[in-house]
Regions:
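DNA-recognition alpha helix
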Residues: 71-84
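Helix-centered, glycine/charged polyanion-binding patches within enzymatic domains
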Residues: 11, 23, 183-184, 188-245
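Two-metal-ion RNase H-like nuclease active-site motif
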Residues: 112-126, 135-137, 181
Length: 300
């Protein structure tokens, strides 16, 4: 160190140009740590025990998801409009069975994000405690590419969601992605862990903070943040009638059906079509019939 440098250091001992110790992080995650929350695998056996027709199941899902009614409201509408008598527990059983069947098929058919995507988490209430639902949405297709639920906002559920959306890093070594996010530190840790075994970064995190643009990054990627905030509001529309969930499994079931509905059944206003068209659903306008076809396709 030269005399001039020593004098600068004495004048400001916190000068980063003379920092002698640096923090280094290395992440060690097992694949079992990165599993996203999903329903149990009892769906086919549950659905085989359903005494009603698939059309009735489609009606239940149409009221429960498309319209956003609670299980008790769904029961009352089925009785008052269609003369179908089901208990609210039967409604929940149909929802649970359908979610368990659709979930594996949904994971196989989630699209990989394009060059630009956004990630965010939103809170839900489970057993009177705060939990979190995580989403990754693609800018171009407007499709949900990854989702997860957890009881914390830590790095592990954030990384699991990124793995669910992008797949393992080895499959993306020659690709580069931009992921817009908020200022939650878990995203930085998750992105660093995802990139750590690659010679070059695969995912570049872009932090968009606040409601107004106070920096160039926020201004450039504000549209991505707004995209996922709109997704969160749509999700909240479906969770609000429940006034919280009595169990984590109930929250998982609804979220699985929501992602399936959002990607494959719900027309997006800016696209004038669903984010991911399914040939079998072409020109099928009946909501119950759409759900019936989707369940049969997932169970095949």
């Amino acid at each position: 160190m030269t005399p001039a440098e020593r004098k600068r250091l004495e004048a400001n001992i916190y000068d980063p140009n003379f920092k002698l110790h640096y923090q280094y992080r290395e992440y060690h995650f097992h694949s079992s740590d990165l599993k996203c929350a999903r329903p149990d695998s009892a769906g086919p056996s549950l659905l085989s025990s359903i005494r009603s027709s698939y059309h009735t199941v489609g009606l239940v899902l149409s009221l429960f998801m498309n319209v956003g009614l609670s299980s008790r409201q769904t029961r009352e509408v089925l009785k008052g409009l269609f003369g179908i008598r089901l208990s609210h527990q039967t409604v929940l059983n149909y929802v649970k069975a359908s979610a368990a069947i659709i979930a594996p098929w949904l994971d196989r058919n989630l699209p990989k994000p394009g060059h630009r995507a956004a990630a965010d988490e939103t809170y839900i209430t489970v057993e009177d405690e705060q939990h979190y639902t995580w989403f990754v949405i693609d800018e171009l297709t407007r499709a949900i590419c990854g989702y997860n639920l957890s009881n914390t906002r830590g790095a592990v559920p954030a990384l699991a969601t990124i793995y669910n959306a992008y797949g393992p890093p080895e499959s993306n070594l020659h690709r580069r992605f931009i992921l817009a996010k908020d200022g939650l530190g878990s995203y930085n840790n998750a992105i660093m862990a995802y990139n750590q075994h690659s010679d070059r970064n695969i995912i570049f995190g872009k932090t968009v903070v606040g409601l107004s643009n106070h920096d160039d990054v926020s201004e450039k990627y504000r549209s991505l943040k707004q995209l996922i905030e709109r997704l969160n509001r749509t999700y909240k529309f479906h969770t609000r009638p429940r006034a919280g969930f009595k169990s984590m499994s109930g929250a998982i079931d609804l979220t699985v059906l929501f992602v399936a509905y959002y990607n494959f059944l719900r027309t997006h206003s800016s696209l004038h079509s669903v984010p991911i068209p399914i040939p079998e659903l072409h020109n099928i306008e009946s909501f119950p019939k759409q759900w019936e076809i989707l369940i049969r396709k997932a169970a095949a």
